[in-house]
């Protein structure tokens, strides 16, 4: 054995007698100072037999060996000569020359000199060979060991098998059972769900079912004057568990002479249920029942490993076709090919003696074996192996002897492989065995079957702490300035210098050990990568005198032909489902192809302006660093991420992070981020590719590539410290008054603010530097406010893009509670009328109905008015007026016809209108007449005079301001402000039609149309005196 730095091991297992003999000879001939033990593999240990005494563990602590007896050798280097039995000790005689005793001398086992008090209570164990069996992992494991106590439960194997058979009869083997996936049905209100369970002796559970709940049957109470009449008897089936009663008047229609047509019993498919019985208008006959789809029945199938679900037929929501029908099909995974052999995903193969590869997604990921260091003068590399092993020098002998090992005779000098890690050599009749020296440079090495040394698949730098580099100060270079990256110092930190191409290429190949016979692959900078080029196809040399700047075309075999390429390579990182567009020369460009009109419904081709200021084409996908985003009909739809709520009052979203955090929080919170064509929404519902829905009142989502992407309202800046949040608003709002500019400011000279990045903002303009911070320009100074987040009660709050505070999605997902009445479905809180006297209301699944009570009338002969519930006296009835069109002139002098809509008075209206409606007074209770108010003439005068006064004031103000060359508001519609450029001592203005206007100190003017920047959420004026000024930009005159 030899010293191996960092090695894991040799010996102690396997053919112990041969190995120990070889080890003794090796240690005797060489100056060994370390013992290398392999990882313990007890399956290769041989049970010591016919031991005269007890057994002890070997030198490596893995296998057992016979203990040394009296007068037998013991000890030696690392105890390779064995340990003495109980009651004996290993005695080493001192050297005759007077040298000191080392740890490598061989001793002899002798009786221990025990004192009488030491022998008290010492009783040697009487070890015997005991055979038996135990049940381990569902199998009978039998064996024979030498021990003092019997560790076996069954003395014979037949007894163990009988016990195992009894266990198997009581509990079936469900490892290979294939159970049908069944979804729990949605039970009607009169029944409860009984979950399925596996009966004794079976593996698959019974299907869940609905059973009638007697407690769900409620007794119906009728109003005075009505009787509770049984309409249909309960059948005992879910949906028909309760007797159906209806309230009918005491003096109802006589049904004795009515002959009802026969009603056939409806047989509903398994995915639907039969609705309740309905009556005709007279209440004598029953109408045919209908079938409606069960809610919550549709689900997504779960396929076994190696197969994926595929839609066979799509459901349309009708009984029998309520849900989509799926089937599980085998998925075809990409394979890797090496030496004409196919390897599938996860398979590992050997590329050469030192390189191993694993197939991952059709790509071979290769890595190199890790060999340890050898401290020996002579070594060799066994045939077919990568790592070398040590060998002893072979001296010439006259009559060398052979070796007998593993049933074979080996000649002097022969080498052979004992196992994956042990290599032996025959030297003069004795086998000398050594182990391969393995190195380890990673945390989790992978064991390759048939190989000794494990290999490292992960990079080794994970065990090295990254350098603590500070920010690069006093450097004007940006990321875009250094195409090949920044230069690094000796600590691995950036310097204010750009790399050149040669330095970048050298770094990519510096640690590469691959020997590629056909060269290396190159990247976009034409630098060689540590990846081998595939074997080139056998192509004839091209005899062509053409000069092709873009290269030659290739045929179907990949060989060059004498035709020039007309298009350059397309370096594009976009993901386009329908491919790329072509330019006028027929070459591909980095733009996604639009959907043809015949492929489906028309899709808007508008572009998306993301919150980071980039434009994206319709149906384009990208990743903004935190979320997957998608441009859908001009809207930026991004995935919801899960973020914890910050505990401080002024959180912020730092550069390079996705979730809000506190200033003293150094732990970076990473957001938690399928099968294509199916999306599983947070509310538990499934949606297909391209389907759009509202997850709450503020968030619209769409299904794209198996991901739920959502678009939310962009909230304006919050110019207060503690905004309030209401349920009817998607954005938090400020209840305090916004900051006002000082009155002493000279309004003749417009003020503006400039931030650290050089952006210019107009006076009273507000913006959001990030999702948690809002700023405003007041008196040429920037004031910023930080939004604080309230605590939430859910475990996984989500964060919308562009917003600061996470919130609980469970609180916003409405519960779809509906009411079923007379064969119709009504939403929660929906009202409807059965007739003029009966009004119903849906409240949390309960149908509540009210009947109008008619008051007594003083007249003798009341009349019945059509559309009214209660009769009325003739003197109280007012006929409905005729709607005669009235001619009115609008502000342009044109004649408009206006048809007045007069209300119909009724004593039975549930919702009473206010008594004062503009210049008309409505009083139903007094005389049921409409009277013009006394102020009608005054309102007419005001409506004419006030606009004239306002117009004159505006004209006079305009003339006065024009003389002083002041700033005046433009009467234009509000729009998102444009981002001004960085200016020096210039006055900035915004024109509603022409864009950004700049006035220099001189008479010259510059005009430029500015691109909108999504970071600036709009112009929010602070001037409360003029409402027109609050929504307008300013222009110099």
UniProtKB/Swiss-Prot annotation:
It holds the Pfam family VWC. SMART domains: IB, VWC, VWC_out. A motif (Cell attachment site) lies at residues 314-316. The chain crosses the membrane at residues 941-961. One of its GO terms (cellular component) is extracellular region. It is found in: Membrane. Keywords: Disulfide bond, Glycoprotein, Membrane, Phosphoprotein, Repeat, Signal, Transmembrane, Transmembrane helix. Residues 962-1037 are cytoplasmic. The keyword DNA-binding does not apply. GO terms for molecular function: PDZ domain binding; serine-type endopeptidase inhibitor activity. Residues 1-34 form the signal peptide. Glycans are attached at residue 330. May play a role in CNS development by interacting with growth factors implicated in motor neuron differentiation and survival. May play a role in capillary formation and maintenance during angiogenesis. Modulates BMP activity by affecting its processing and delivery to the cell surface. This is Cysteine-rich motor neuron 1 protein.
